[in-house]
């Protein structure tokens, strides 16, 4: 099982291609169901547009369906690629431990981009491709929570110390957002972000 951690608009889809996983890996991602189901019910993929209550309830059902789908494939010992923003870190830790316990090898990959980059990517994804738009407020909330979990509390590195877990990116790459000030660090080299994608260079 491979987990890819990253906030909305961080480039997780791009990283999936970079990792070059075999085609038999099954992607577990609620947002893919959202993009398939919402239009069937006449619901906009722009999460800022109403009806909010209907969208929230439908998304909860899709999250449950995704969890059930994952259980089904785990029972069949299928290889999985789990795409997650990583904000519910305790739940992720429980899932990782459960997978290792039943015999899975687990690998983790984390992406760290500044919240402003996440917001920009989310906006461009909607404007250029018509794909889902989370919106700047929620995107920033998710990005800030991700920074707290992954960067400040070093949960990603802690997970890497668990039995049966391998880190595919073994450094916090790079710590470009200062969670204390809410600003991009002055020493951040913006050249690591090119062509609206995250280029994985050595810090």
Task: Please provide the spans of the model-predicted regions.
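Conserved GTP-binding G-domain of TRAFAC-class P-loop NTPases and closely related GTPase folds
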Residues: 117-203
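Conserved substrate/cofactor phosphate-moiety recognition/catalytic segment
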Residues: 13-76, 90
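The conserved Walker
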Residues: 7-8
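Short, hinge-like loop/turn segments at secondary-structure boundaries
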Residues: 44-47, 99, 125-128
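Loop/turn-to-beta-strand initiation segments
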Residues: 76-81, 105
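Conserved phosphate-donor/acceptor-positioning beta-strand/loop module used by diverse small-molecule
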Residues: 100-122
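Acidic, metal-coordinating catalytic cores used for nucleic-acid/nucleotide bond scission
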Residues: 82-92, 115
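Short hydrophobic/aromatic beta-strand immediately N-terminal to the Walker A/P-loop
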Residues: 2-3
């Amino acid at each position: 099982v491979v987990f890819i951690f990253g906030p909305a608009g961080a480039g997780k889809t791009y990283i999936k291609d970079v990792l070059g996983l075999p085609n038999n890996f099954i992607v577990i991602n609620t947002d893919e169901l959202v993009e398939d189901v919402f239009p069937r019910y006449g619901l906009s993929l722009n999460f800022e547009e109403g009806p909010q209550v209907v969208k929230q309830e439908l998304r909860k059902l899709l999250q449950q369906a995704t969890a059930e789908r994952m259980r089904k494939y785990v029972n069949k010992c299928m290889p999985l690629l789990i795409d997650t923003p990583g904000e519910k870190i305790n739940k992720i830790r429980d899932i990782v431990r459960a997978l290792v316990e039943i015999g899975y090898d687990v690998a983790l990959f984390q992406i760290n981009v500044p919240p402003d980059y996440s917001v920009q990517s989310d906006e461009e994804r909607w404007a250029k491709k018509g794909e889902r738009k989370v919106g700047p407020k929620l995107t920033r909330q998710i990005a800030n929570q991700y920074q707290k979990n992954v960067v400040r509390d070093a949960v990603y590195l802690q997970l890497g110390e668990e039995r049966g877990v391998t880190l595919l990116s073994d450094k916090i790459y790079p710590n470009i957002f200062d969670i204390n000030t809410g600003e991009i660090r002055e020493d951040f080299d913006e050249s690591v972000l090119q062509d609206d994608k995250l280029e994985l260079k050595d810090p």
